[in-house]
Design a protein with these regions (language model features):
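ATP/NTP phosphate-donor binding region
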Residues: 2, 6-57, 291, 298, ...
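Glycine-rich phosphate/pyrophosphate-binding beta-alpha loops
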Residues: 132, 187-200, 266
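A generic structural signal for short beta-strands and their flanking turns/coil linkers
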Residues: 166-168, 182-184, 207-212, 246-250
Length: 340
């Protein structure tokens, strides 16, 4: 058995992870080869080369973007994907119940099982977690321009941009039916979440051969707390502003070209966006004792609490900033009046 490690920028120290990997990897099962990515798209090329060489597994050290680059070269091959998550969201790893701690993730590489999962395509670009149009795609574009990474940066961009983003009207064609929606966003889930346990498609599974589509209709500021709460509570599909359905293929028609996202990465596409599911296309190393499409209750509870705290802190900070601006403006106006 052979293993290739891909390395790319992320939120944790890769050198430390590589040290742990050298210490903990089962040398009797794996011959270790470490290759550093040098540019965007480099992982696609090298993973394809390793798949042609019939490597047993290619291990992604990074987040969903890195995983996407590697996995797209491994679909419909005998080479499995392994994940040591250290990105800003880690949506696919979380869905697969791969531990966020690198040492424990390495244990999964040594002792895990190989499962076969679905993946999706958006205008023939592969995705493994989620894709979509609308606000989440717009935020992914802003996030890609940010100097800082991580969940707080994403949350900050989400809160700031939500104040000025305007919903669009979309025509949806799915499995023979056509619908028209005015929507804030349309998300297509192969997996259940964006990352950081933000469940945009809470009922999605990786092996049912279906896309889980979530439509968020226009909402008011009064809806934000409940939407945020339910996003992390895995119940957003119960909100009255949400429409959901399942399909194998979906065409999204919009009035003009714009940004889409796939696994959190933005890309410009035209008026027509075609999304489809590809059944059982990728082999993945998963925990041996993982329950199908459930997660550790205590871990989910802690992640949920952390998510709510981040949202609350961000709202408080945003409100405090706005109040300060109003107060400063009031002081300036008062000074002008007193000088008259």
């Amino acid at each position: 058995r052979q293993m290739c490690i891909r390395d790319r920028s992320g939120t944790q120290s890769k050198e430390q992870i590589l040290k742990w990997l050298d210490e903990k990897l089962d040398k009797e099962r794996y011959a270790q080869e470490v290759i550093y990515t040098e540019r965007a798209g480099h992982a696609v090329e090298i993973a394809a080369q390793k798949a042609q060489e019939d490597a047993h597994a290619v291990i992604a050290i990074g987040g969903d973007g890195t995983i996407n680059e590697i996995a797209r070269s491994l679909v419909h091959t005998k080479t499995a994907l392994g994940i040591i998550p250290c990105g800003s969201g880690n949506g696919l790893a979380r869905h697969l119940q791969i531990p966020m701690e690198p040492k424990k993730a390495i244990d999964i590489i040594n002792d895990g099982l190989i499962d076969i999962i679905d993946y999706g395509k958006i205008n023939d670009v592969p995705f493994f977690c989620t894709c979509g149009v609308g606000f989440d795609a717009f935020v992914s574009l802003q996030f890609s321009k940010a100097g800082r990474r991580g969940p707080l940066t994403y949350l900050e961009k989400t809160l700031l941009e939500s104040l000025k983003y305007r919903p669009e009207t979309y025509e949806l064609e799915m499995d023979g039916s056509t619908l028209r929606y005015k929507a804030f966003l349309i998300a297509c889930g192969n997996a259940s979440q964006y990352g950081n346990n933000a469940y945009i498609a809470p009922q999605a599974t990786l092996n049912d051969g279906l896309l889980d589509v979530t439509i968020l209709e226009p909402f008011t500021v009064l809806d934000v707390p409940s939407l945020s709460f339910q996003l992390f509570n895995k119940t957003i599909d119960q909100n009255s502003r949400i429409k959901t359905f399942r399909c194998q293929t979906l065409r999204i028609h919009r009035s003009k070209p714009g940004v889409v996202h796939f696994d959190g990465d933005p890309m410009m596409m035209g008026e027509n966006v075609d999304v489809k599911i590809m059944k059982k296309g990728l082999q993945v190393i998963v925990p041996r004792d993982a329950e199908k499409d459930t997660s550790n209750v205590l871990q989910r509870a802690q992640d949920y609490i952390n998510g709510l705290k981040q949202i609350n802190d961000a709202f408080v900070e945003d409100i405090a900033h706005k109040n300060k601006m109003i107060l400063d403006k009031g002081k300036r106006q008062f000074k002008k009046l007193t000088k008259m």
